[in-house]
A protein has these predicted regions:
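Alpha-helical segment proximal to the catalytic Tyr-Lys
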Residues: 128, 177-179
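Residue(s) in the substrate-gating loop at a strand-loop-helix junction
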Residues: 149
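C-terminal substrate-recognition "lid" of short-chain dehydrogenase/reductases
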Residues: 223-247, 252
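Conserved mid-core segment of classical short-chain dehydrogenase/reductases
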Residues: 91-109, 128, 132-138, 158-161, ...
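Active-site helix of classical SDR
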Residues: 123, 165, 173
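Canonical Rossmann dinucleotide-binding motif of NAD(H)/NADP(H)-dependent dehydrogenases/reductases
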Residues: 3-33
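Catalytic Tyr-X3-Lys loop
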Residues: 90, 101-121, 145, 169
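Catalytic Tyr-x(3-8)-Lys segment
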Residues: 113, 205-226
Length: 256
């Protein structure tokens, strides 16, 4: 699927990897709808890139109705949807047994709801809208790209909730691709390593240095633009389906 003139929905598209994806797809001729809750950042991006290229709808992906409304907004503004990229999510660090109490169950549920259930919520409703498309010359109607993490394979100490949520995204990738194959919609997942997002840039050296040491080649943190580049390649490569791709410079997470 070519990028030019395609309509792309990006959750978390106002910051970090999502913002990089927004910028990359707009630069390559796509129209983007940002689904986020960061009004200030999203509106600033729309002003910078042009309201004719990118629009924004405040969306809590953990709830059904806001995502239904967002899909209706996409159809109203652009008429159709070709690509959905799920970047919205967050992390949380806590050991199963802390010094004073066990891991808070509500915190575990929140991470699962946002990172896993939220991803599934957007995927199912985006697929419903994509299914209305006539399809490309090869019959393809849409592409869905979810975001996991290398923590979904080798989570560190204190990452039980985050690892479970991202392993869930990885686990449903092939099944989702098989489910949606009859609708001519592809599903793939990117599992990023450590990227130089604002959150990581603000971390103290004692956090950054061990992570940097684990990178191989290139021996550095990933740049958000590199995530956007891979997302674009997934869209453009019609035979790539049901795969989770690690984007991590051959990094493997250590226990801590």
């Amino acid at each position: 699927m070519e990028l030019k003139d395609k309509v792309v929905a990006i959750t978390g598209g106002a910051s970090g990897l999502g913002e990089a994806s927004t910028r990359h797809f707009v630069a390559n001729g796509s129209k983007v709808m940002i689904l986020d809750i960061n009004d200030d950042n999203a509106k600033a991006i729309c002003d910078e890139l042009g309201d004719q290229n990118v629009k924004y709808v405040n969306t809590n992906i953990m709830e059904e109705q806001p995502v239904i409304d967002a899909m209706s907004k996409i159809e109203e503004e652009f008429g159709k949807l070709h690509v959905a990229i799920n970047c919205a999510g967050t992390g949380y660090g806590a050991r199963i047994l802390g010094k004073e109490a066990p891991h808070l169950l509500d915190h575990f549920k929140f991470i699962i709801d946002l990172n896993l259930v939220g991803t599934f919520n957007v995927m199912r409703l985006a697929a419903q809208l994509m299914d209305k498309n006539e399809g490309e010359e090869n019959g393809e109607k849409g592409v869905i790209i979810n975001t996991a993490s290398i923590a979904g394979y080798e989570g560190q100490i204190g990452q039980s909730a985050y690892t479970a949520s991202k392993a869930g995204v990885i686990g449903m990738t092939l099944t989702a691709a098989r489910d949606l194959a009859r609708h001519s919609i592809r599903v793939n997942t990117i599992a990023p390593g450590i990227f130089d997002t604002p959150l990581m840039m603000s971390a103290p050296d004692k956090v950054r240095d061990p992570l940097l040491e684990s990178t191989q080649f290139p021996h550095r943190f990933g740049q958000p633009a590199e995530f956007g580049m891979l997302a674009a390649h997934i869209v453009e490569n019609p035979y790539l389906n049901g795969e989770t791709i690690r984007l991590d410079s051959a990094m493997r997470m250590t226990p801590r």
